[in-house]
């Protein structure tokens, strides 16, 4: 789908003080949604256990790792957990499981002793006593040594380990091999001129920290109603906008499963109505994607399905308005994008450690759990991926802008203070 063209008109003064309308044409781009993988048409999870997901993942990733370890350690034999022999070096492939002392358990909520020992609810569940286990269909073995750090890995990762069984029955890890970045389609940077994609996250319309004026400044900048002719020329180069989740915040206490009074129903719908007004202004001139987030009125489990169209009576009138899944995948002028609203990274932050969010994102690529193939992380085979972490707009007033010509990024910062 091609983004709609928009004209900006403003008066230009000549020496004879005659007003002349100057037109600025918004640039076009070619958009294609690739959300079919995440679009659930029918119920598919009924009666399934999590173990089936792990076994399916292990089967897929093990086949891949078997083909790669022959180049990694060609002279070291590959065996299963059950086939380990004490002191004999080998390679085992399996799913990591992380034993965590502070990890919450649903049974703790119903424990008889819970009143005597309060539940621990930290933001991070790391503990010095945490350890890793590797599991395949034949069994599981505790991992030892200093090569494999429990603080880096989480449950669910599939890796190949070089090591040997100790007298205590543990597996002493000597080296670790991860799948690495997936084979990449040839990056096609078709654009020879500057075209920009704007990413916004955590607008949180309706929250106590949301600043309507700050959001309106963003909308006015995108639509070309802010600034002089130079600013409007920059706005005309914006060809796509992505709202990456948590666009609204419903007042707490209203969604408790009870029948709502008419006054409460109005409070419940006000944030969505306000968001629709702003999105309508943007969709009138540029293509817009809106993804659901953890605070939005959508299903909770991933993949989250698109928000209901009935929530946006104004925006849905434009064919430039796209309701998307989370994760969301699309192509724009030959560049492929894959992103989430952040739940996967938030979970990694609870159960492991890293310098920043970008390092967590890089790990998902190396583990191939969520591996985009769009173009600065460099793989061993020359793969190039641009990682973008978008801050919460209602707290920072910052949006992220990507140039389709060279994949360079910069930020847009909006500030607004109310006078007392």
Q: Model-predicted segments: where are they?
A:
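Extended recognition/assembly regions associated with phosphoester-bond processing machinery
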Residues: 1-420
């Amino acid at each position: 789908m091609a983004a709609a063209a928009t004209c900006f008109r403003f008066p230009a003064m000549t020496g004879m003080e005659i007003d002349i309308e100057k037109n600025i044409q918004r640039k076009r781009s070619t958009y294609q949604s690739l959300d079919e993988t995440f679009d659930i048409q029918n119920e598919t999870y009924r009666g399934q256990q999590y173990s089936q997901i792990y076994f399916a993942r292990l089967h897929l990733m093990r086949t891949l790792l078997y083909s790669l370890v022959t180049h990694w350690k060609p002279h070291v034999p590959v065996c299963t957990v059950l086939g380990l022999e004490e002191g004999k070096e080998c390679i085992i492939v399996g799913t990591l499981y992380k034993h965590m002392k502070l990890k919450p358990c649903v049974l703790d909520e119903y424990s008889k002793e819970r009143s005597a020992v309060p539940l621990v609810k930290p933001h991070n569940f790391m503990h010095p006593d945490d350890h890793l286990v590797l599991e395949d269909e034949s069994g599981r073995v505790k991992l030892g040594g200093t090569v494999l750090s429990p603080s880096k890995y989480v449950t669910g990762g599939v890796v190949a380990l070089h090591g040997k069984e100790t007298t205590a029955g543990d597996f002493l890890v000597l080296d670790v091999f991860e799948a690495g970045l997936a084979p990449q389609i040839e990056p096609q940077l078709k654009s020879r001129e500057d075209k920009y994609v704007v990413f916004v996250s955590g607008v949180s319309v309706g929250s106590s920290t949301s600043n309507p004026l700050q959001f309106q400044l963003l909308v006015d900048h995108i639509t070309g109603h802010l600034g002089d002719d130079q600013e409007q020329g920059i706005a005309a180069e914006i060809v796509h906008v992505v709202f990456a989740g948590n666009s609204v915040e419903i007042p707490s206490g209203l969604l408790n499963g009870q029948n709502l009074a008419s006054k409460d129903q109005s409070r419940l719908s006000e944030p969505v109505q306000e968001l629709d007004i702003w999105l309508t202004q943007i969709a009138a001139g540029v293509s817009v994607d809106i993804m659901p987030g953890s605070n939005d009125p959508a299903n909770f489990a991933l993949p989250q399905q698109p928000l209901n169209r009935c929530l946006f009576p104004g925006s849905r009138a434009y064919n430039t308005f796209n309701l998307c899944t989370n994760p969301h995948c699309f192509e724009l002028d030959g560049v492929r994008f894959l992103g989430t609203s952040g739940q996967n990274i938030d979970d990694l932050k609870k159960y492991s450690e890293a310098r920043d969010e970008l390092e967590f994102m890089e790990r998902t690529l190396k583990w191939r759990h969520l591996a985009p193939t769009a173009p600065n992380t460099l793989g061993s085979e020359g793969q190039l991926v641009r990682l973008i972490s978008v801050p919460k707009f209602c707290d920072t007033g910052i949006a992220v802008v990507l140039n389709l010509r060279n994949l360079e990024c910069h930020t847009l910062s909006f500030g607004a203070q109310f006078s007392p």
